[in-house]
């Protein structure tokens, strides 16, 4: 992205898109129901389904920033798949359509990116039907057919295939088709959260298919493996693979708490994670497993967030969530030890480790709502990031839910207003 946020970096990473889906879904649920957020989520998931989902159900890793203009080009050019020459737009569209498009997007004869136009909105808001129809015309130029006729777009897996295969539209960027557990898990979390809010069946289908692929295919000799190339798992998993996968499973459980399938998987994977990565002496998780670090001078325990969250930040929050869902306080003790291990960093450089701060929020304010399944349709779409849900039929007379924090519980809530007030009071009490 440039300094003015006009031109994006055109490379599309799975981990970026998974995080933005979750973030926008949370924004929507936090009393910010801006239609542009929902449109961005919808468009991202459509792209994911169309271009980044393998027939087996997992998600590809990335798409290149550049692509070939034609089969005779020696080198690919950045952003050509997405950018528009002014003369090209003038030939594709009627004069009225071009005028309408210019009223919504910055479009000039000189362009804003190497002489071409990257379509940037003048302002937000809902696009009109007329503008959507014009954008569909441009989609057809890119892909050779309309969106409704293009459910899947097979990837170009290398430059040779990109240049030599017959494409109905423009030559697409090359797609890295390997499966990475950590990156898939970030997208699964985003889809799970979006499903909890919008109840779109496709979000759940995509999330659970990818998850099931990992559960069915990424274990060899009882160990999780990080990568999959064309159906073959390889490379022992790192701490982020375990942490993000466990979070994804917990997010699926949160989106559909009526069954414990995902929670049962979490418990087993957490045990494996602890066995090979947990620092008994210091607390926290090493980046590499015990049996895959013989050549390392130092076994590091990363805490900084970068393009993806820190494994330790996510893992500690997972432990707190697990404690609330299972009533196993050993998980809570682990979380406390890990937070203590990173306490100096939290005090001195909090801006470097926002995921650890989120984990601290879970530890201090995390709560569990015990309720009947009928109330979940109301609770799950709410922005309650440190709340877990347990299904129970054993509620006192007239009660709809019981809110518990740690070993103590509040008085049974008899209506939704009382329940929401209790949850708010817990997060503001300290």
Model region roles, listed by residue range:
Residues 1-430:
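Glycan-recognition and catalytic cores of secretory/periplasmic carbohydrate-active enzymes
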